[in-house]
Curated annotation (Swiss-Prot):
PROSITE patterns: RIBOSOMAL_L19. Keywords: Ribonucleoprotein, Ribosomal protein. This is Large ribosomal subunit protein bL19. It comes from the Bacteria. The lineage of its organism: Bacteria, Bacillati, Actinomycetota, Actinomycetes, Mycobacteriales. The keyword Nucleus does not apply. The gene is rplS. HAMAP family: Ribosomal_bL19 (MF_00402).
Length: 113
C-alpha cells in the first residue's frame, strides 16, 4: 500500500452506497449560511464517476425549469449528509456526456430490472 493511501484511509467514508453512472440519486448536501446549517437535496442522474480514494468525485445532472444543472461532488466529502439511490439505470457507458445534447424523453434512461 502506498504511503498516501495509508494516510488517506482515515478520511474515507464507509456509509456511501454502491452507485454507478446512470443511477438516479438524492444527494443531501449540508449548506452553511452564516451560523445556520441546513440540508439541501439535489436529485439527478449520475453522468460520471472518476478518481479514486479520497479524491474520487461524481457528477450529477438534472434539468431544472428547462435548464440543465450539473453538480460535481467529492464522494468522501463531510458536506454530504447522505446519498440515496432512487433508481438503478441501465446504460452501456461510463461517461454519459451525451445526455447534455438530448431533450425530453430522449434523455430518459432505462431502469435496470
Amino acid at each position: 500500500m502506498n504511503t498516501l493511501d495509508f494516510l488517506d484511509k482515515k478520511s474515507l467514508r464507509d456509509d456511501i452506497p454502491e452507485f454507478r453512472p446512470g443511477d438516479t440519486l438524492n444527494v443531501h448536501v449540508k449548506v452553511i449560511e452564516g451560523s445556520k446549517e441546513r440540508v439541501q437535496v439535489f436529485k439527478g442522474v449520475v453522468i460520471r464517476r472518476q478518481g479514486g480514494g479520497v479524491r474520487e468525485t461524481f457528477t450529477v445532472r438534472k434539468v431544472s425549469f428547462g435548464v440543465g444543472v450539473e453538480r460535481t461532488f467529492p464522494v468522501h466529502s463531510p458536506n454530504l449528509a447522505q446519498i440515496e439511490v432512487v433508481t438503478r439505470g441501465d446504460v452501456r457507458r461510463a461517461k454519459l456526456y451525451y445526455l447534455r445534447d438530448l431533450r425530453g424523453k430522449a434523455a430518459k434512461i432505462k431502469e435496470k430490472r
